């Protein structure tokens, strides 16, 4: 999860 992909790869 990075700032550019929070929606596609959220840090859960």
Curated annotation (Swiss-Prot):
One of its GO terms (cellular component) is extracellular region. GO terms for biological process: neuropeptide signaling pathway. Keywords: Amidation, Neuropeptide, Secreted. The modification Valine amide is found at residue 12. It holds the Pfam family Periviscerokin. It comes from the Eukaryota. It is found in: Secreted. Abdominal perisympathetic organs. InterPro entries: Periviscerokinin. Belongs to the periviscerokinin family. Mediates visceral muscle contractile activity (myotropic activity). This is Periviscerokinin-2 type 1.
